[in-house]
């Protein structure tokens, strides 16, 4: 027997998805840095988001691999989008990143952020950054603070 979702629950899921899409579209429209870096939003849902970019020669450091800030920026953007999908204006208060594999020019990176835990005021997120071969090239963890403001009311 297949479990069924109650009609009211389906409506709630659809509403949460639409809110997530609206919030992220609004944030991306104002995010000139992410646009300049060539980032794209590839997936959005309640408390999750994925972003993508292709590493260009201008993004490499003196060792010929991508500067750590490239993966960090991509992961941080996915994190920001994911933790704002519930509609509250939410800000990063702590994050860290590990780079288990090199990133080279031409790599297409996808950062996928997911909520690991939530409280009334804090959200804890994990972001995996993978290359086009599916290899994890960066692991990011972030803590976010939920303000009292909602999207559309920010100053």
Regions from the language model: what does each represent?
Residues 1-155:
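Terminal targeting signals and extreme-terminal segments of soluble enzymes
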């Amino acid at each position: 027997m297949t479990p069924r979702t109650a009609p009211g629950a389906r409506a709630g899921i659809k509403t949460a998805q639409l809110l997530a899409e609206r919030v992220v579209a609004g944030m991306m429209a104002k995010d000139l840095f992410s646009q300049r870096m060539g980032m794209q939003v590839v997936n959005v849902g309640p408390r999750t988001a994925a972003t993508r970019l292709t590493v260009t020669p201008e993004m490499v450091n003196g060792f010929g691999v991508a500067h750590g800030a490239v993966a960090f920026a991509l992961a941080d953007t996915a994190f920001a989008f994911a933790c704002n999908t519930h509609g509250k204006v939410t800000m990063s208060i702590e994050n860290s990143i590990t780079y288990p594999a090199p990133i080279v020019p031409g790599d297409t990176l996808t950062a996928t952020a997911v909520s690991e835990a939530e409280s009334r005021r804090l959200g804890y997120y994990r972001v995996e950054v993978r290359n086009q071969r599916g290899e994890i090239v960066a692991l990011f963890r972030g803590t976010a603070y939920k303000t009292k403001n909602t999207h559309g009311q920010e100053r």
